[in-house]
């Protein structure tokens, strides 16, 4: 869902300088539980795509356990790991480059986007995933991580 801004009641503090979301932007936001319920509803039957999945899924795992009493349970694709595998594998095209999202976008000739903006990061990640899929012979099962059920 585009434009969903959680509001847990806490001030954003210095993190506003990174993600650009200010306290006044969150006035009409939803609670964490409602935001996570919407996320869960949108993920059913789908694969999540992240650029550094361990970081994102750890955050989601903690938030979901706290707010919903369940953990992260969806398959995911990590474009960072996939891009790095292409760097260290037999693919000379990516050899030794930085692997952060902007570097991956630049490597594949994609235009720059605003970093640390949730929607722009999601679109950037999806575009990199589409390019990696087009350039790879890997099957979904080879690049998709299945969740560990705890």
How would you describe each model-predicted region?
Residues 121:
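Conserved catalytic/binding loops enriched for acidic/polar residues
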Residues 70-75, 138-142:
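Short, structured loop/turn "capping" segments at alpha-beta junctions
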Residues 88, 107, 126-150:
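Acidic two-metal-ion nuclease catalytic site recognized across multiple nuclease folds
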Residues 60-62, 86-89:
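Short, well-ordered secondary-structure micro-motifs
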């Amino acid at each position: 869902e585009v434009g969903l801004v959680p509001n847990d009641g806490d001030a954003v503090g210095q993190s506003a300088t990174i993600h650009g979301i200010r306290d006044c932007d969150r006035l009409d936001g939803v609670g964490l539980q409602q935001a996570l319920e919407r996320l869960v509803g949108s993920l059913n039957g789908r694969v999540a795509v992240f650029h550094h999945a361990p970081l994102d899924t750890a955050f989601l795992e903690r938030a979901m356990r706290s707010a919903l009493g369940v953990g992260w349970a969806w398959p995911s694709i990590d474009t960072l790991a996939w891009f790095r595998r292409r760097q260290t594998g037999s693919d000379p095209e990516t050899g030794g480059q930085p692997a952060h999202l902007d570097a991956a976008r630049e490597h594949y000739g994609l235009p720059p986007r605003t970093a640390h903006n949730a929607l722009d990061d999601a679109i950037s990640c999806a575009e990199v995933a589409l390019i990696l899929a087009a350039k790879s012979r890997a099957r979904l099962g080879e690049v998709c991580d299945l969740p560990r059920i705890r």
